[in-house]
Amino acid sequence: MGIKVDPKKCVSCMACELACGYHRDDGFALLSSCIMVTRGREKKDYSAVVLKEEENLVIARPEGLEIRKLGSTGEASSGREKEDASAKPLLLREPCDLCGDREEGPLCLQFCPVNAISMN
Amino acid sequence: MEYLSSNKIAIIDLGASKTIQKELDEDLVKEKIGGAGITTALYEEYRDEDPIVLGTGLLTGTLAPASALGMVTAKSPVTGKICHAPFTLYGGVELKYCGFDYVVIKGSSPKPVYLWIHDGIADVNDGKEIWGKDVWISTDMIREVMGDPLIQILAIGKAGESESDFAQVCINYWASGDRWGFGKLFGQKKLKLVAMRGMSLLEIADPEGFVRKCKEFLSTIKSGPYAGKGGIGELSAAMGEDIRQWLEPIIHRHLSCFNTPFPTNTFVFLDEDPKLLKETEKKEPGFLITDVHGLLGYKKLGLSAAEACDLLRDCAKYGIDAVAVAELSQKAGKKKPDEIKKSLSGLKGSLESVGKGKFSPWAPSFTLSSDEWERRQAVAYLFGIHPIYALMSPEFSEEKLIELANLGTGLGFTSETLDKVIIDILK
């Protein structure tokens, strides 16, 4: 069981990122989220939703889903430079735990305003 | 100020090229709530030094729906009044997280400068390399120099540098809600741009209570009349000027500002197939429409959607208010894109579309009376709620916002506090 993202529905509002950050830090911050909306290609209007799972990096792009095994070739460059333009690269963060300590399940799913996130 | 806050104010003296920091006094928050309440108080405190005050609302950057708002408060060169202009997208949240809730920019610099505000540090840097560049190039240069494409930037273009009355402070590459000529103020101060980036942590007085309440509000909103809709065309339709069919062929997608349930922005592709899903090879394929009024202004001139959006792009690069350009073009009988483009430099005239109050007319009035619109804007600018979204979601009531503010800060705000602050800021 895991989180599934429909990037065509995503409006890049970052609510999932902040909800995940809250789950990690008990405050509002964006540095610990294991889900993020890539915003580095603003002029091209191109973004993806990237999720770090226990064993995989899931990249939900508008044109299709890519799943990379963590530790595989190419992971570092794409994870750090292209998809993940952040101060703390996603690969250095804790993987998704599906908000296991929360009765209502993952917070990112609950805070997505356009229902772009669901459970697999 | 312990909660929902970075607890700091930066006071930047452009004349002396120095910055000092002050704590954000909790008593000031209790009295003025936040946002426009505090930017107005700071403006008054530094009034003699012609300040520009940047600020965020009490709930900006939180899980409160639509908590996207940052604002510029200053004396408008257009109206002569103290006014507030919104900046949304990711600008408000970035200011909140960069270590300062408020930034007072006072005095004038003798030479071009820019501000680099990040992680609790506010530096005045030499701006000679970017002075003379348009908004897009300036934004690219700063992001490249700093090595971070997520830096959020409030910038002026050549309109601001030449002190045009219609100069706008843009957000990254796009138009903002600045209808007050604040771009001219930036230019007069030789302030080319403000670059913001931060990674703060905002603490919450009652974390689980706050988040639970945010979730309840979002749940109500998701079953509201705008659920499943989005984009600048929907805004126009709600205003009674439906441009959805006219715009549809060039729409790439609709985008939200930070944590805003309704996407109020629309990205159009002008030099690329709008249906393209994968990343385009083109460096600058289109434009993000953030202001419905500018678009409507060009449509009234009889332009195609592509011509109108191309002009919006030129206005944003030049850093000039597209609404003013459209109105003055109409008055001058200019209806061809090329002649309108040529008129950006040295544009003069008087406008009828100027806002009459404190808040930018960027947020449409929809079907509200002017008093209702003004009160709702005041509430949005105090709490940091997207000003357009605040008008679209009456279910996100004043009582609910006060309840959230109290869960977040533990400060015990009341409806009487809110009434008093609104009266103060509308004076």
Predicted regions and their residues:
Chain B
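Protein-protein interaction/assembly regions in multi-subunit complexes
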Residues: 1-179, 183, 188, 192-201, ...
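Extended C-terminal regions of large enzymes
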Residues: 13, 19, 28-31, 68, ...
